[in-house]
């Protein structure tokens, strides 16, 4: 089976080399659709022997992606964004997956690099070249809607997934979002789509969560609740979207109504989706219980998160705080150190480690941990560095 790689780009000279290099040894052809680059994007694509086409940007990612599909020639299509890379370890299982004569679509697990709360998502980026597969939705473009229509008429096709992380994505790191004004672009495009599809649960979830992140909490809450009402009225529930709605509603309510937030997190965790995708709700549910004083309940949830993903640094840090509160200082220290090993720039874990080491009388190692925490806080211009330094000064420690 031949595999085509498809990507749309504009001014991606910094990210594109890593993206194309990650798929070079896997795919049979590269199709690059440029939407108006003024930097070295096209030259970089040419250096990878990609076939390059141009498209006038029309504020619609689906339109651009569908244009790129016109040029692919392989039996299967793999789609990435320039700020994504394919994980090398997944290549053998990906090759095996596209040999299946029964599958129309293979969903892939994507990891959001630097995301603490919801590090994983499932994306429909590997699919058979079928004349009726098309992208829909102008911002979060996906083929799911067209695949659903195909299955109604060709029910013998199967949908599969690869359970291991296949894609690494760094486009939602704070620096990238700020540099590209991603929030404003996403808001404009999704609001336009919402005006024509006011009760679409998926866009209600995505745009509602975006409103909350931008500080428009009331507007976001209303949209999330609308999405929840809409999806509950559907004959066939989309479990991943229902999870996201409950997860985001839990986040909104967590500050003012912990019981309502807990109900939403519980319902999110109950959805029939890949366990990795539930980590955000499991971790946040644990935070609610910890804040309420239910330390054993919180401990169980953090341990559940680590059973799913032993490399989840935030769960190690949160479990460390819970164990410290339970008086299990040695175990707490071990989890803080694991969190730091997994995420060396984890200032909060260093700070928590310092507090616990001081508690057990290990002053020298404690001060070393505090110095690391302060240095990281200062690198990120966080006011927590000054607060920590002042707190230590009041205790008689001058760092």
Please provide the spans of the model-predicted regions:
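Short aromatic/hydrophobic "clamp" motif used to bind/position activated sugar donors
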Residues: 77
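Conserved alpha-helical positions within TPR/SEL1-like repeat arrays
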Residues: 205-209, 244-254, 279-290, 314-325, ...
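A conserved acidic beta->alpha catalytic loop
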Residues: 34-46, 57
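Catalytic-site signature of metal-activated, phosphate-bearing donor transferases
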Residues: 69, 86-215, 219-222
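Flexible helix-coil transition and linker loops at the boundaries of alpha-helical arrays
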Residues: 193-196, 228-244, 270-279, 378-380
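Register position in tetratricopeptide repeats
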Residues: 213, 254-255, 291, 325, ...
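Helix-start (N-cap) detector for alpha-helical repeat units in TPR-like alpha-solenoids
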Residues: 201-202, 235, 243, 275-279, ...
């Amino acid at each position: 089976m031949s595999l085509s790689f498809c990507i749309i780009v504009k001014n991606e000279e910094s990210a594109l080399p890593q993206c194309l290099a990650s798929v070079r040894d896997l795919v049979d052809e590269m199709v690059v659709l440029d939407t108006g680059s003024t930097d070295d994007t096209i030259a970089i694509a040419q250096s990878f022997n990609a076939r390059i086409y141009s498209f006038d940007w029309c504020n619609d990612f689906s339109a651009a992606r569908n244009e790129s599909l016109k040029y692919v020639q392989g039996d299967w299509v793999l789609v990435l964004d320039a700020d994504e890379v394919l994980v090398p370890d997944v290549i053998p299982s990906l090759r095996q997956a596209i040999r299946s004569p029964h599958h129309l679509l293979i969903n892939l697990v994507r990891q959001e690099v630097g995301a603490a709360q919801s590090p994983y998502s499932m994306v429909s980026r590997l699919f058979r070249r079928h004349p009726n597969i098309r992208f829909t939705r102008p911002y979060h473009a996906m083929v799911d809607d067209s695949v659903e229509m195909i299955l109604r008429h060709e029910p013998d096709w199967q949908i599969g997934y690869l359970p291991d992380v296949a894609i690494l994505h760094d486009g939602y790191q704070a620096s990238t979002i700020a540099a590209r004004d991603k929030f404003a672009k996403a808001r404009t495009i999704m609001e336009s789509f919402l005006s024509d599809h006011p009760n679409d649960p998926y866009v209600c979830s995505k745009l509602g969560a975006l409103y909350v992140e931008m500080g428009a909490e009331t507007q976001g809450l209303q949209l999330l609740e609308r999405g929840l009402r809409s999806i509950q009225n559907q004959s066939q529930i989309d479990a991943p979207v229902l999870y996201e709605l409950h997860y985001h509603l839990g986040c909104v309510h967590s500050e003012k109504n912990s019981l309502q937030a807990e109900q939403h997190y519980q319902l999110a965790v109950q959805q029939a989706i890949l366990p990795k995708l539930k980590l955000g709700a499991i971790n946040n549910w644990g935070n609610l219980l910890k804040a309420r004083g239910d330390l054993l309940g919180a401990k169980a949830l953090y341990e559940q998160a680590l059973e799913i993903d032993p490399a989840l640094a935030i769960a190690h840090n949160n479990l460390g705080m819970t164990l410290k509160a339970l008086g299990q200082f040695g175990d707490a220290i071990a989890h803080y150190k694991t969190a730091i090993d997994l995420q060396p720039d984890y200032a909060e874990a260093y700070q928590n480690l310092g507090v616990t080491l001081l508690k057990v009388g290990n002053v020298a190692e404690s001060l070393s941990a505090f110095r690391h925490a302060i240095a990281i806080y200062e690198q990120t211009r966080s006011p927590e560095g000054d607060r920590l330094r002042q707190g230590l000064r009041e205790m008689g420690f001058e760092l």
